[in-house]
UniProtKB/Swiss-Prot annotation:
<protein>
    <recommendedName>
        <fullName>B-cell lymphoma/leukemia 11B</fullName>
    </recommendedName>
</protein>
<feature type="modified residue" description="Phosphoserine">
    <location>
        <position position="772"/>
    </location>
</feature>
<feature type="modified residue" description="Phosphoserine">
    <location>
        <position position="765"/>
    </location>
</feature>
<dbReference type="GO" id="GO:0070244">
    <property type="term" value="P:negative regulation of thymocyte apoptotic process"/>
</dbReference>
<dbReference type="GO" id="GO:0033077">
    <property type="term" value="P:T cell differentiation in thymus"/>
</dbReference>
<dbReference type="GO" id="GO:0033153">
    <property type="term" value="P:T cell receptor V(D)J recombination"/>
</dbReference>
<keyword id="KW-0488">Methylation</keyword>
<feature type="cross-link" description="Glycyl lysine isopeptide (Lys-Gly) (interchain with G-Cter in SUMO2)">
    <location>
        <position position="617"/>
    </location>
</feature>
<feature type="modified residue" description="Asymmetric dimethylarginine">
    <location>
        <position position="322"/>
    </location>
</feature>
<feature type="modified residue" description="Phosphoserine">
    <location>
        <position position="398"/>
    </location>
</feature>
<dbReference type="GO" id="GO:0000978">
    <property type="term" value="F:RNA polymerase II cis-regulatory region sequence-specific DNA binding"/>
</dbReference>
<feature type="modified residue" description="Phosphoserine">
    <location>
        <position position="110"/>
    </location>
</feature>
<keyword id="KW-0991">Intellectual disability</keyword>
<feature type="modified residue" description="Phosphoserine">
    <location>
        <position position="488"/>
    </location>
</feature>
<keyword id="KW-0597">Phosphoprotein</keyword>
<dbReference type="GO" id="GO:0008285">
    <property type="term" value="P:negative regulation of cell population proliferation"/>
</dbReference>
<feature type="region of interest" description="Disordered">
    <location>
        <begin position="471"/>
        <end position="583"/>
    </location>
</feature>
Length: 894
């Protein structure tokens, strides 16, 4: 302490508790104070045996004592623990200087608390280490205040006298400390007052505004965070730790011995030395910031500027857990303090620097890695994403995905080497927190968030995020190619030579796409092996027979042969006679009118997309005239009969084609169907409506020209050689859905894949009967002109969900679950279903032969099960249940 301040020492708390037996020692201390020189410690040491063997170093305040003055050292320890800092604070006072407080005001102490504070005289300025604390400037004292360092407090046992004035908690003694302790909860700044000399009023630490009035203890403490008053410093400390989450002291318990503040290596001396915060030892090991070491601005200002350096900190720290935290697993909220509260975070980052013995303990390097996208912290919770990951790892396309990083290190034991890293059992998504067992599944799942679609089709603009989806998409191209293969009348194969540039183009594209897919995912399921022709022919005939037996006759049978003739002609097959130009144009206009009427009668006219397509078709007549080639034979039958236009040029046993422009829309109801008088055909009409509704996507998805050209060829190919009069798609090659469009499972939209020129120029030319003819080139490999495997030959795909079916009838029923269509209706009630078997099962509820029949009294509807009748009454006649007759019947029963 400077000579100017020796006459007016700083105000100290009067809770100085000294036993009477130590009075003679106190006198000896005052006599020896004049010649005692206090040396500035160069570092931290133990309780005994400091850096110099001839010196005694206090383990709490790092004050050195000559070995000959051991009594002074003992009394220094006793007086500090009693709450009086006079022996430590004014060790260099002159003999004539009055003590800071009279002994009559001191109280008796029965158990010591080790607290010390160091003040160095002016003669030892050259030995000073960097500033270790900020002491507020007092009003009535001239000159700056000497910086002092507050020591760490060792935990002590509770007193056996609960009602005595013994301090039983380490931090309760802080009420006796001078107001120079910079803690996060308050700032040490002077408070103006009108006291006499030596009684300057100063704000007390720990977030309290102490009203010092010259007494031994302030009368009230006010928390600067919540403005709650306290009449005791101990209550304020408890409030700060329990309410605001500050780790100030260690609560007594069995684990207290392992959580004592540890001794650290001394800070380096010099102008660039780091200012060590006095708070470092008051925060336990469990504080997350004690495990960090971050470079930041150091307090190198004059101690007098400490008023604005440590502002009052709001409650930004949540109560940390009471166990050792792994610095590698710091949450995003803790790391986010760097950006949100830089000053507070920098202040706390200076707590208790640790010796870096291994690269794993270099936390500053770890933080730089976190900021440099080299590691991904785990998500805060499975239900939400990690905001820190989005801050540090913004998505950007790169050769290596930023998500493919090493997993975080496991928690390390407090005193051991890092354990070997066990294999992670689950992977979690950084966006939604969903966990996966395999990394590959997590990578595919991330693409749903990022929109990345690395797998692209070479035949169209389809792209997907998974190789299996590309494989499924490629099957639709194979179905398109396979659907172009025809079928003869007798169901057997009839070889024909294709036009150059028809199937070869699509075959080459499929080969390239197949090779690209095999590059992405080596899956042998796309390989096609040839099968026996006899087996294929038998299966085709059996399948054809089953379809013919399972489908009812309909009035559209008159169109099947005619449509085949037109589709054959539309393919541009050479040798087909054509009609005259004028007759073809008139016939085209007539067919356009018939098409509009058919769409209105069937119900397609009510849908806006079909109306737009029809209007657009009329505008693009020139394109359709160029697309349709060949002649028209046997097209004079406009009545509703079963007109079989089998005469004309024979292609695969069919009639000839039609002239250009005579078929504006082949395949879509070439002639107006006859009315459906019988109720048995109602279901057939419904089924046709369902399929027609699903054939065309919304017009806004793709260009209308592409819609028309591909829909035209796809639907014509689907109905090319059907023997079943009622849209009998016997396999996937004849389905209008598998040939005209494919479902994109990525965005839920319908896309048309095949370019119009490939199919319109010659896509329908020269196809054989059952596609088993050896002359038809195989698309993507040798063999027949369609996928040779049983699954690929019979499978068909739903356009809505992508589900694959082996039977087209199952696909038709499945589509109704998406569209809500229920064509099968009960004639006795208003029950409707999408499957005939369900209607049959429903009809059993109306009565069976040989069983008792229950009839509804209101509508006379029969039921074979009484519970069904009760349900019917409640659902349809609930308002009639409580009629007078029912009430009378209920009264009789009661």
């Amino acid at each position: 302490m400077s000579r100017r301040k020796q006459g007016n020492p700083q105000h100290l708390s009067q809770r100085e508790l000294i036993t009477p037996e130590a009075d003679h020692v106190e006198a000896a201390i005052l006599e020896e104070d004049e010649g005692l020189e206090i040396e500035e410690p160069s570092g931290l040491g133990l309780m005994v045996g400091g850096p110099d063997p001839d010196l005694l170093t206090c383990g709490q305040c790092q004050m050195n004592f000559p070995l000959g003055d051991i009594l002074v050292f003992i009394e220094h320890k006793r007086k500090q623990c009693g709450g009086s800092l006079g022996a430590c604070y004014d060790k260099a006072l002159d003999k004539d200087s009055p003590p800071p407080s009279s002994r009559s005001e001191l109280r008796k102490v029965s158990e010591p608390v080790e607290i010390g504070i160091q003040v160095t005289p002016d003669e030892d300025d050259h030995l000073l280490s960097p500033t270790k604390g900020i002491c507020p400037k007092q009003e009535n004292i001239a000159g700056p205040c000497r910086p002092a360092q507050l020591p760490a407090v060792a935990p002590i046992a509770a007193s056996s006298h609960p009602h005595s004035s013994v301090i039983t908690s380490p931090l309760r003694a802080l009420g006796a400390l001078p107001p120079c302790l910079p803690l996060p909860c308050c700032s040490a700044r002077p408070v103006s007052g009108d006291g006499t000399q030596g009684e300057g009023q100063t704000e007390a630490p720990f977030g309290c505004q102490c009203q010092l009035s010259g007494k031994d203890e302030p009368s009230s403490y006010i928390c600067t965070t919540c403005k709650q008053p306290f009449n005791s410093a101990w209550f304020l400390l408890q409030h700060a730790q329990n309410t605001h989450g500050f780790r100030i002291y260690l609560e007594p318990g069995p684990a207290s011995s392992s959580l004592t503040p540890r001794l650290t290596i001394p800070p380096p001396l010099g102008p660039e030395a780091v200012a060590q915060s006095p708070l470092m030892n008051f925060l336990g090991d469990s504080n997350p910031f004690n495990l960090l070491r971050m470079t930041g601005p150091i307090l190198r200002d004059h101690p007098g500027f400490g008023e604005g350096r440590l502002p009052g900190t709001p409650p930004l720290f949540s109560p940390p857990p009471r166990h050792h935290l792994d610095p590698h697993r710091l949450s995003a909220e803790e790391m986010g303090l760097v950006a949100q509260h830089p000053s507070a975070f920098d202040r706390v980052m200076r707590l208790n620097p640790m010796a870096i013995d291994s690269p794993a303990m270099d936390f500053s390097r770890r933080l730089r890695e976190l900021a440099g996208n080299s590691s991904t912290p785990p998500p805060v919770s499975p239900g939400r994403g990690n905001p820190m990951h989005r801050l540090l790892n913004p998505f950007q396309p790169s050769p290596k995905s930023p998500f493919l990083s090493t997993p975080p290190l496991p928690p390390m034991p407090p005193g051991g080497t890092p354990p070997p890293q066990p294999p992670a059992k689950s992977k979690s998504c950084e966006f939604c927190g969903k966990t996966f067992k395999f990394q590959s599944n997590l990578i595919v799942h991330r693409r749903s968030h990022t929109g990345e679609k690395p797998y692209k089709c070479q035949l169209c603009d389809h792209a997907c995020s998974q190789a299996s989806k590309l494989k499924r998409h490629m099957k639709t191209h194979m179905h398109k190619a396979g659907s172009l293969a025809g079928r003869s009348d007798d169901g057997l194969s009839a070889a024909s030579s294709p036009e150059p540039g028809t199937s070869e183009l699509a075959g080459e594209g499929l080969k390239a796409a197949d090779g690209d897919f095999r590059h992405h995912e080596s899956d042998p399921s796309l390989g096609h092996e040839p099968e026996e022709e006899d087996e294929e022919e038998e299966e085709e005939e059996e399948e054809l027979l089953l379809e013919n037996e399972s489908r009812p006759e309909s009035s559209f049978s008159m169109d099947s042969e005619l449509s085949r003739n037109r589709e054959n002609g539309g393919g541009g097959v050479p040798g087909v006679p054509g009609a005259g130009g004028g007759a073809a144009k008139a016939l085209a206009d007539e067919k356009a009118l018939v098409l509009g009427k058919v769409m209105e009668n069937v119900g397609l006219g009510a849908l806006p997309q079909y109306g737009e397509l029809l209007a657009d078709k009329q505008k693009r007549g020139a394109f359709l005239k160029r697309a349709a080639g060949g002649g028209d034979a046997g097209d004079d039958d406009d009545a509703g009969g079963c007109g079989d236009a089998g005469a004309g040029g024979a292609v695969n046993g069919r009639g000839g084609g039609f002239a250009p422009g005579t078929e504006p829309f082949p395949g879509l109801f070439p002639r107006k169907p006859a009315p459906l008088p019988s109720p048995g055909l109602n279901s057939a009409a419904k089924r046709i409506k369902v399929e027609k509704d699903l054939e065309l996507p919304p017009a806004a998805l793709i260009p209308s020209e592409n819609v028309y050209s591909q829909w035209l060829v796809g639907y014509a190919a689907s109905r090319h050689f059907m023997k079943d009069p009622f849209l009998g798609f016997t396999d996937a090659r004849q389905s209008p859905f598998a040939t005209s469009s494919e479902h994109s499972s990525e965005n839920g939209s319908l896309r048309f894949s095949t370019p119009p020129g490939d199919l319109l120029d010659g896509g329908l030319s020269g196809r054989s009967g059952t596609a088993s003819g050896g002359s038809t080139p195989h698309l993507g490999g040798p063999g027949p002109g369609r996928p040779s495997s049983k699954e690929g030959r019979r499978s068909d795909t739903c356009e809505y969900c992508g589900k694959v079916f082996k039977n087209c009838s199952n696909l038709t029923v499945h589509r109704r679950s998406h569209t809500g269509e229920r064509p099968y209706k009960c004639e006795l009630c208003n029950y409707a279903c999408a499957q005939s078997s369900k209607l049959t099962r429903h009809m059993k509820t109306h009565g069976q032969i040989g069983k008792e029949v229950y009839r509804c009294d209101i509508c006379q509807m029969p039921f074979s099960v009484y519970s069904t009748l009760e349900k019917h009454m409640k659902k349809w006649h609930g308002e009639h249940l409580l009629t007078n007759d029912v009430k009378i019947e209920q009264a009789e029963r009661s």
